[in-house]
């Protein structure tokens, strides 16, 4: 008896068929769920309860039993019977019936499923439209079972046929799951219309709309919307063909309409889109009247003969003619609107109306202020989260709030908040009562509401412009690397702060500060500036004991340390007056203390009968040497800090070095027409634009440009950090090996049992190990495939190591490649 040949239509006996036979799976579809599981995060390995709907013959249940954790509950159900499987519960039932639901509840008890699988399909082959709808209906029933049994965050995998109901099902899935994705695994045949949808993150809504799982509601056919005839009339060139067939009862493609119907119709555009020709009835009385219009030209009569060839201009001409015809026939008469009598308001009603308007304006103002306060609070919260606790950041942020909310240092000093500001406290916006205590700050409550609204609108417009400018800068930073580097450096500061002078012995630093802060000085012209100076000095740690560092002075300037020094005993021993070991630093401190208390000395001199004369001590040669060393070190430090990086700076340095310019010339150049421009209360975008153009073009020299070029050449010639570090590591390893060699050689020399010859040989071996060269990569031997080597298979005779067979064709190809590369290089240069 001969063997029957198994059918192989659509390539059914493919490699997955044979793989399933080898692995022991019941069907090739098992590889579909394996590939889906690997692609979407191995959800089966995390599932303790799995339900497989339409499970026959059971291949997906086999995969689940292999991949799920031990002692997992796996249930398979199908309308046809299945062979039993180990670790899997199977029963026969229809998933669309109540019997299936009750059996599932009986097996699961109080558990919920982590994953629900569905690979079912109807018996196909009659009508594709009907088969696709039946599959979509079956998928919706499977989703209904999954919604009843899935745990929160569960996974649902189902099969769908590509059809017109696909998008409707996807919309339903997206309402119930967080993430919905369609996929087609490689195990699925390309000729098959099936695709698989993986829904992850079940939302488990408390109340579910029953229409969401009702097939009648989900797959309802919606009527088509009205045709866009306006697009046909105003864009006749763009034609989109839709093969929808004929309208019911109308089987003609050519339509003619009398011209007077076009005049009387309410929707002329609809008629123009569906009509091919307008006919003229010469016996019509109304046409005889309309024919006398000046718009009724021969061109008009030619256009109405074939409407399908007209353009936008021609259609507009027809609509203008229709409007003129309707006016002539009296069809566009405006409906007379009944006159509304206006009753004048009484005095009480007028007052009440004005009060309502004022109340509305007041409510708008309160709403605006509340919104501003919420924005300020939100900014403060963001600032605290970003740890922006420095007073500079707070002041910059508060400057955009407005005059009423802007803090004042003088008010802060009076209310006792200045110390909190120095410590970095966040509260900088004062209340209305605190501002009222200060006589300099007045809040105009009687200002008209309209003026205040205009000011608020102006502020809002300015803030919008600033925001737009910041967005522009952010986009430019992303696009332009040079601008990003410039912003990171902070840009060029045009403000000139004068020359930094080094404090001399005769005029210590503290005495200079006292001189600057004197009442006769012009720096502190107001109480506000004085408070600012005090706050800055307190923050920087300039006040306090000079023996401490700047950070320590800033710490001990805090108000919590006030009065602590009075309680602590003095631990500093007083040095005798005759001691000769006092350093120059000690003498500087004594001189600074004397110079900082000039007023007290003057009072003491007036009260005392003795005249106090300062003791002038001769400084030794060592002091002069130390002064020279200090001055030299300070110059070296200044040279390290100042880097001449531009051609202008190099030109200026050359001129100063050669005596062509002096310090006074540079100071005079600092006073120009751009120096004293008013920059207060100007927006940032305006200042940035002005900074680009409001600057003096300083001259440069050829020598300075060459010097900068040579400097950059030297910088570029230096190796990069990685190369330098690699060389240093290599050198360090060599030194370490040499040190080890020295130790070993010393041990060999100390060994008395060995002869001098043996010692020399061992030391030579050690030296050979240290100085051995790295292994060179073996070269590939090129063998020309001609003569006895032509058509040779295997290794040629007399060739050892790696080899490569070459011929004349390969040589020509290499030449051609070099020629093409050279041509491309020439093109790229142009």
UniProtKB/Swiss-Prot annotation:
Catalytically driven reaction(s): a ribonucleotide in rRNA + S-adenosyl-L-methionine = a 2'-O-methylribonucleotide in rRNA + S-adenosyl-L-homocysteine + H(+)
Keywords: Coiled coil, Methyltransferase, Nucleus, Ribosome biogenesis, rRNA processing, S-adenosyl-L-methionine, Transferase
Annotated GO MF terms: rRNA (guanine) methyltransferase activity; rRNA (guanosine-2'-O-)-methyltransferase activity; rRNA (uridine-2'-O-)-methyltransferase activity
Localisation per UniProt entry: Nucleus, Nucleolus
Gene Ontology terms describing biological process: maturation of 5.8S rRNA from tricistronic rRNA transcript (SSU-rRNA, 5.8S rRNA, LSU-rRNA); maturation of LSU-rRNA from tricistronic rRNA transcript (SSU-rRNA, 5.8S rRNA, LSU-rRNA); rRNA methylation
Active site per database record: 159
Primary site of residence: nucleus
Residue ranges of coiled coil: 345-388
Protein name: AdoMet-dependent rRNA methyltransferase SPB1
Organism: Eremothecium gossypii (strain ATCC 10895 / CBS 109.51 / FGSC 9923 / NRRL Y-1056)
Gene label: SPB1
């Amino acid at each position: 008896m001969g063997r029957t040949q198994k059918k192989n239509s659509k390539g059914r006996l493919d490699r997955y068929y044979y793989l399933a036979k080898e692995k022991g799976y019941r069907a090739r579809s098992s590889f579909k769920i394996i590939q889906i599981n690997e692609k979407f995060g191995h959800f089966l390995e995390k599932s303790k309860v799995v339900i497989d709907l339409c499970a026959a013959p059971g291949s997906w249940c086999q995969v689940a039993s292999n991949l799920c954790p031990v002692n997992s509950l796996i249930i398979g159900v199908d309308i046809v019977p299945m062979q039993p499987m180990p670790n899997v519960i199977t029963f026969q039932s229809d998933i669309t019936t109540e019997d299936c639901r009750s059996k599932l509840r009986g097996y699961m008890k109080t558990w919920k499923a982590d994953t629900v699988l569905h690979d079912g399909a109807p018996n196909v082959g009659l009508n594709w439209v009907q088969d696709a709808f039946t599959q979509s209906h079956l998928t919706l029933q499977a989703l209904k079972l999954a919604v009843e049994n899935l745990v929160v965050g569960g996974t649902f995998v189902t099969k769908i046929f590509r059809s017109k109901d696909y998008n409707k099902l996807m919309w339903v899935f997206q309402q119930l799951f967080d993430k919905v994705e369609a996929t087609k695994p490689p195990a699925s045949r390309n000729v098959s219309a099936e695709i698989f949808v993986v829904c992850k993150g079940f939302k488990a809504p408390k109340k579910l709309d029953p229409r969401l799982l009702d097939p009648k509601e989900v797959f309802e056919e919606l009527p088509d919307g009205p045709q866009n005839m306006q697009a046909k009339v105003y864009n006749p060139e763009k034609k989109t063909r839709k093969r929808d067939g004929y309208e019911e009862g109308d089987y003609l493609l050519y339509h003619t309409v009398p011209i007077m119907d076009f005049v009387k119709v309410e929707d002329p555009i609809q008629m123009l889109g569906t009509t091919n020709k307008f006919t003229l009835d010469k016996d019509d009385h109304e046409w005889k009247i309309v024919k006398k219009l000046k718009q009724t030209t021969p061109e008009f009569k030619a256009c109405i003969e074939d409407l399908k060839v007209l353009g936008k201009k021609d259609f507009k001409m027809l609509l203008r003619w229709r409007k003129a015809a309707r006016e002539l026939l009296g069809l566009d008469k405006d409906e007379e609107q009944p006159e509304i009598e206006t009753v004048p308001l009484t005095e009480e009603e007028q007052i009440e109306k004005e009060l309502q308007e004022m109340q509305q304006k007041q409510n708008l103002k309160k709403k605006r202020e509340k919104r501003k306060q919420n924005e300020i609070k939100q900014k403060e919260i963001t600032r605290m989260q970003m740890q922006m606790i420095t007073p500079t950041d707070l002041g910059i942020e508060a400057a955009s709030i407005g005059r009423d909310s802007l803090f004042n240092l003088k008010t802060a000093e009076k209310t006792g908040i200045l110390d909190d500001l120095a410590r970095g406290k966040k509260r900088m916006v004062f209340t209305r009562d605190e501002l009222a205590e200060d006589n300099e700050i007045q809040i105009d409550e009687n200002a008209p509401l309209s003026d205040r609204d205009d000011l608020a609108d102006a502020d809002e417009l300015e803030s919008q412009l600033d925001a737009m400018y910041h967005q522009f800068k952010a986009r430019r930073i992303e696009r332009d690397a040079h601008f990003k580097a410039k912003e990171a450096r902070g840009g060029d500061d045009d403000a000139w702060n004068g020359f930094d002078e080094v404090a001399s012995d005769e005029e210590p630093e503290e005495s200079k500060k006292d001189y600057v802060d004197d009442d006769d000085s012009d720096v502190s012209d107001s109480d506000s500036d004085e408070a600012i100076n005090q706050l800055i000095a307190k923050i920087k740690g300039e006040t306090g004991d000079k023996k401490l560092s700047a950070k320590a002075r800033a710490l001990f300037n805090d108000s919590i340390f006030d009065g602590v020094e009075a309680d602590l005993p003095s631990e500093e021993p007083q040095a005798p007056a005759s001691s000769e070991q006092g350093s120059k630093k000690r003498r500087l401190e004594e001189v600074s203390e004397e110079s900082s208390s000039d007023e007290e000395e003057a009072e003491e001199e007036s009260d005392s009968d003795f005249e106090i004369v300062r003791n002038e001590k001769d400084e030794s040669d060592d002091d002069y040497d130390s002064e020279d060393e200090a001055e030299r070190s300070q110059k070296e430090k200044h040279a390290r800090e100042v880097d001449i990086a531009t051609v202008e700076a190099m030109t200026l340095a050359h001129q100063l070095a050669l005596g062509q310019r002096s310090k006074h010339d540079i100071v005079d150049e600092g006073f120009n027409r751009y120096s004293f421009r008013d920059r207060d209360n100007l927006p940032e975008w305006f200042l940035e634009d002005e900074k680009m153009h409001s600057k003096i073009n300083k001259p440069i020299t050829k020598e300075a440009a060459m010097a900068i070029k040579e400097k950059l050449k030297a910088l570029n010639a230096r190796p990069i950090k990685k190369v330098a570090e690699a060389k240093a590591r290599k050198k360090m390893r060599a030194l370490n090996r040499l040190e080890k060699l020295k130790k070993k050689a010393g041990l060999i020399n100390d060994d008395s049992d060995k002869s001098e010859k043996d010692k020399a040989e061992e030391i030579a071996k050690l030296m050979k190990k240290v100085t051995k060269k790295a292994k060179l990569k073996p070269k590939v031997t090129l063998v020309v495939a001609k003569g006895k080597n032509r058509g040779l298979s295997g290794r040629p005779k007399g060739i050892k190591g790696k080899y490569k067979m070459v011929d004349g064709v390969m040589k020509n190809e290499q030449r051609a490649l070099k020629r093409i590369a050279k041509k491309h290089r020439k093109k790229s240069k142009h």
